[in-house]
Amino acid sequence: MSRIGLRPIEIPQGVEVKIDEKNFAVVKGPKGTLEQQLSKDMEIKIEENVINVVRPTDNKKHKSLHGLTRTLLSNMVEGVTKGYEKKLELVGVGYRANKQGDKLVLTLGFSHPIEMVDPEGITVEVPSQTEIFVKGINKQVVGNYAAKIRELRKPEPYKGKGVKYANEVIRRKVGKTGK
């Protein structure tokens, strides 16, 4: 039984949700518009200011799609109202981040600086040289872009150098013991 799928989604004031007969969802809000094709097996009901997702049967596939569909809709509604944000930190001597127009320029100890162009719908802020904020309305795109930045230089376990999420805890290892 999908407990997440059973929870109703409340539609806040100023958000407009449209779902056609093929389960193509369009959510408009103060921050923007999101569109996504949802599973055709699920039945999505909009009554007053509440969205309910109903599954047709109790087989395993429908149970998993039930929770997924509800979560995707909930993320869309939250994205157009509040938006999403990931904070990254650069740890290490000489590790820096700069913003040049729509490019993020990272100096991560390689022989060359790395330039990354911001994807559409994403804003990147660099308040200091060691902090990066990735913001947007689509949770998936924000998370993927933050993961791409982190992938360039993952934190290593000995000194903790690298690009890490702000709330990430790096398990440290003990180095070699000298004679």
Curated annotation (Swiss-Prot):
By its UniProt entry, which InterPro entries does this protein fall under?
Ribosomal_uL6-like, Ribosomal_uL6-like_a/b-dom_sf, Ribosomal_uL6_a/b-dom, Ribosomal_uL6_bac-type, Ribosomal_uL6_CS
MF annotations from Gene Ontology: rRNA binding; structural constituent of ribosome
Alphabetically ordered keywords of this record: Ribonucleoprotein, Ribosomal protein, RNA-binding, rRNA-binding
Gene Ontology BP terms: cytoplasmic translation
Gene encoding the protein: rplF
**Subunit structure comment from the entry:** Part of the 50S ribosomal subunit.
UniProt signal peptide: none
The answer to whether keyword rRNA-binding applies is yes
> Which protein family is named in the record?
Belongs to the universal ribosomal protein uL6 family.
Main role? Answer: This protein binds to the 23S rRNA, and is important in its secondary structure. It is located near the subunit interface in the base of the L7/L12 stalk, and near the tRNA binding site of the peptidyltransferase center.
Identify the Pfam families for this entry. Ribosomal_L6
Entry keyword Cell inner membrane: no
What do the Gene Ontology cellular component annotations say? cytosolic large ribosomal subunit
Write the protein's name: Large ribosomal subunit protein uL6
Q: Which source organism?
A: Alkaliphilus oremlandii (strain OhILAs)
